[in-house]
Swiss-Prot record:
Free-text function comment from the UniProt entry: DNA-dependent RNA polymerase catalyzes the transcription of DNA into RNA using the four ribonucleoside triphosphates as substrates.
Organism for this UniProt entry: Haemophilus influenzae (strain PittGG)
Catalytic activity: RNA(n) + a ribonucleoside 5'-triphosphate = RNA(n+1) + diphosphate
Chain positions covered by the region annotation Alpha N-terminal domain (alpha-NTD): 1-234
GO molecular function: DNA binding; DNA-directed RNA polymerase activity; protein dimerization activity
Annotated protein name in UniProt: DNA-directed RNA polymerase subunit alpha
Protein family (similarity comment): Belongs to the RNA polymerase alpha chain family.
Gene Ontology biological process terms, A to Z: DNA-templated transcription
Description of how the protein assembles with itself and partners: Homodimer. The RNAP catalytic core consists of 2 alpha, 1 beta, 1 beta' and 1 omega subunit. When a sigma factor is associated with the core the holoenzyme is formed, which can initiate transcription.
One GO cellular component term noted in the UniProt record for this chain: cytoplasm
Length: 328
């Protein structure tokens, strides 16, 4: 097989070894050298942490107020019962949140098949033992909440949303992922004269809620969707929004009354229709001294007050007055 030095080999599905209904081995080859570990590790991490599924999240057991207790006639303590419920494998169609019920009495094991559910729910492991009743008169009733989610979510991370939950509603660590075990191995592969290629062997076990091949297919889809953003890589940063600087310093738009001049000086300025500080700073000393009743003492006062604000007489302001003042 002769090709361009820049052309990468694409793997093809070589074999699916179905060990059981929940256990399979998938072999992919050929892969370029190093790609076996690159792809195998990425798929393994997604399969372990990011696969969606359904899990028990809350339980209510008649006569039980908290998980650190026991129930008469039940061999296991409540913590062990909750642990067994975590092992329940459930498929739910068309819903993200369902309530299941269980009612059992008499001596013997209580199994997943004893759970009552509607047609949208399938118990994958009906023989899974939840607890044992040890007395003919013993009974147990519970309401089991099953929700759809992703990965593993401990009960402690959900307590902040359950501050007002009723007494007796027990939270369960939710293991949504249907994948129970995943391992991969990279072996040597050969294509014609090339002997430096990889063969990826993925071995996967699920709880039965999802077939192993479908789990790998979904993990590969998730990985491909995440990498799509890099295929058409471009700068997607938001353009900088430049703040428009005001045309005039805000202090120039304030009335001369804000300068707190003496009554004499203020009245002289108003008589000359000088209403804003912007009007005042454009006047020269000579112009102000021509104002009736405004002498050198008042002029000095005005100059000092303007100087304290970083202003002075004789300034030139383009486009004065602004439209907001001109309209007034």
């Amino acid at each position: 097989m002769q090709g361009s030095v820049t052309e990468f080999l694409k793997p093809r599905l070589v074999d699916i070894e179905q060990i059981s209904s929940t256990h399979a081995k998938v072999i992919l080859e050929p892969l370029e050298r190093g790609f076996g570990h690159t792809l195998g590790n990425a798929l393994r991490r997604i399969l372990l942490s990011s696969m969606p599924g359904c899990a028990v999240t809350e339980v209510e057991i008649d006569g039980v107020l908290h998980e650190y207790s026991s129930k008469e006639g039940v061999q296991e303590d409540i913590l062990e019962v909750l642990l067994n419920l975590k092992g329940l494998a459930v498929k739910v169609q068309n819903k993200d949140d369902v309530i299941l019920t269980l009612n059992k009495s008499g001596i013997g094991p209580v199994v997943a098949a004893d759970i009552t559910h509607d047609g949208d729910v399938e118990i994958v492991n009906p023989d899974h033992v939840i607890c044992h009743l040890t007395d003919e008169n013993a009974s147990i009733s519970m309401r089991i909440r099953v929700q759809r989610g992703r990965g593993y979510v401990p009960a402690s991370s959900r307590t902040h949303t359950q501050e007002e939950r009723p007494i007796g509603r027990l939270l369960v660590d939710a293991c949504y992922s249907p994948v129970e075990r995943i391992a991969y191995n990279v072996e040597a592969a050969r294509v014609e004269q090339r002997t430096d290629l990889d063969k990826l062997v993925i071995e996967l076990e699920t709880n039965g809620a999802l077939e192993p091949e479908e789990a790998i297919r979904r993990a590969a889809t998730i990985l491909a969707e995440q990498l799509d953003a890099f295929v058409d890589l471009r700068d997607v940063r938001q353009p900088e929004i430049k703040e428009e600087k005001p045309e005039f310093d805000p202090i120039l738009l304030r009335p001369v009354d804000d300068l707190e001049l003496t009554v004499r000086s203020a009245n002289c300025l108003k008589a000359e229709t000088i209403h804003y500080i912007g009007d005042l700073v454009q006047r020269t000393e000579v112009e102000l001294l021509k104002t009736p009743n405004l002498g050198k003492k008042s002029l000095t006062e005005i100059k000092d007050v303007l100087a304290s604000r970083g202003l002075s007489l004789g300034m030139r302001l383009e486009n004065w007055p602004p439209a907001s003042i001109a309209e007034d």
